[in-house]
Amino acid sequence: MRLHFLPLVALCATTASSLAFDSSTSQPPGAQVYSVNDAAGLKRIGAHHPKYHDRRTVTIRSSHNDTDDVSADFLWGIRRANHGGRLLLKKGQKYVIGRKLDLSFLDNVEVQLDGELKFTDDVPYWQENNFYYDFQKSISFWRWGGHDVRIFGRGTLNGNGQRWYNEFAGQEILDPDNTYYRPILFVAENATRLSVEGITELNSPCWTNFLVNSKDISFDNVFINAYSTNASAEPKNTDGFDSLNVNGLSVTNTRVDIGDDCFSPKPNTTNIFVQNLWCNNTHGVSMGSIGQYPGVLDIIEHAYIENVTLLNGENGARLKAWAGEDVGYGRINNITYKNIHVENTDYPIVLDQCYFNIPADECASYPSQVNVTNIVFENVYGTSSGAEGNVVAELICSPNAICEDIKLKGINLTTPEGEKGVVVCDGISGGVGVECQSSE
């Protein structure tokens, strides 16, 4: 199966919305442009920083309320700031985005987000007007792309997800019959040297960040949160970080409080660096899932993950690969987890090669074809939740895959009662470096 990444233009009701957002040579009402030499003006509006060089700075009007769409103003502003400038979204101001935006043209531009960028929750509009990706039927409000893009500030990118949570309750993203597609909060596609620093990402309808066909992407000091005001409709699939075909992905000094994967690079992500990551109520720091699509080679390799805290979750350090009748193949290689602190976590360490929820008999009949090699779990410590009894690590290799050079070093994991945890492993060539019990 060959994956394509094309806008879902076939579902657009008309072309009117895209025409409305063509850039204009006329300056919209309320917009201002400040010269790089106007130090007093830049300081007055909050665009002068010791950490960053001054730039030509553009401001746009803010929204009067949650239905006052400033998409056209935003597009004008970022075009005006492109090629060496900065778009400032001011502290204490709200900027509502109600139309899809193609921001794939960026070159040497900064966006200083000190206010709030908030998407409308017009579900019918977004389900017909979006950017679509074949991979797990993903859609997005917008897409960012280009070279040398920096997004920074102390503001909030708000996905306004509550309506999406309510209407998706009881459904599953990987259900083949699912047609209720939910937008990803931030997508970078065909981007090189894009960084996100300091902002909060709030209540994404689906995944929070999705990086596609990109190189040298970094996130630093970001806070990601997803919560629901409806106890019967919790956020689902709000992963912190997902990636596809990315070389060079860095996440540092970041806090994630959501209900799904904290960090989970997907197929063909290489050269990964994670440091000082805090995850609460998540499915862990996962490599994968990979091997989902028939005949497709997937790779995740060269990852270094250090100083991670994982609280109150299903998994800690996890490797996951698909099994089943019509799946792909690949490898997870050269992955290091070091200094990983877990508390109240069901599976602190896990290799899952029967993903996604594949019944045991089907997994046995159609095992995963993803090789897992050169993996180190070092200084993983803390407590399990007790959900799996005294098992704190489970590493079970597919009979159709190679699993070798997988080592556990300095593991200190206990049950909630303080008893030493048990490591379960099967099919690992050469052992794992600690005492290990068979799953049978």
UniProtKB/Swiss-Prot annotation:
Primary location recorded for the protein, binned into one broad class: secreted
Known glycosylation sites: N65, N190, N230, N268, N280, N307, N334, N371, N412
One Pfam match: Glyco_hydro_28
Keywords assigned: Cell wall biogenesis/degradation, Disulfide bond, Glycoprotein, Glycosidase, Hydrolase, Repeat, Secreted, Signal
Enzyme superclass (EC): hydrolase
Location in the cell: Secreted
Family membership: Belongs to the glycosyl hydrolase 28 family.
Protein name (Swiss-Prot/TrEMBL): Probable exopolygalacturonase B
Record organism: Emericella nidulans (strain FGSC A4 / ATCC 38163 / CBS 112.46 / NRRL 194 / M139)
